[in-house]
Amino acid sequence: TMALDAATLALTARELKETLTDAKIAKLFEPTRDELVITLRTRTDTYALLLSARSGSARVCLTEESVENPETPPSFCMLMRKHLTGGKLRDVRMEPGDRIVYFDFQCTNEMGDLVRNTLCAELMGRYSNLVLVQNGKIIDALKRVDFEASDIRQLLPGLPYTTPPKPARPDFL
């Protein structure tokens, strides 16, 4: 598969923003260990958004193919459902030259308060990940990273969310 460069990703993010802003989350699935599929409804259509953190084919895109889902949803999927189901997509954004796409959802928590949950799709080869963040703190990550795995950046529930360190080489657009 072709490596996803920042320019292509920026175009994809813009298209997703145009298509999906204000769409409501209907369902969430985790068909494979590294992929999340979110079904979103606009007034006129239903879309399936694929977020893949698979090392060889990390990407975000709309998908047509229906996938087999495990009978018992994995714990990350259950958590995503708890925090995102019924939420509205308010924005899809990314920093120029970066490889992280931020999906901002307006959701209602258990107390009935409106909260903003951001799903961060970090699309960086074998370090790709999906991280759910609220108020700057990590709710959870698809691939948790503890101190043993990295002394530079940990991804664990409750820790502040920081973006990955920038690569040394410039990313020419």
Segments and roles (model prediction):
Residues T44-L173:
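Phosphate/anion-contacting hairpin/loop surfaces
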Residues L4-E68, T72:
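A structured, charge-rich N-terminal accessory region that forms the first stable segment of a protein
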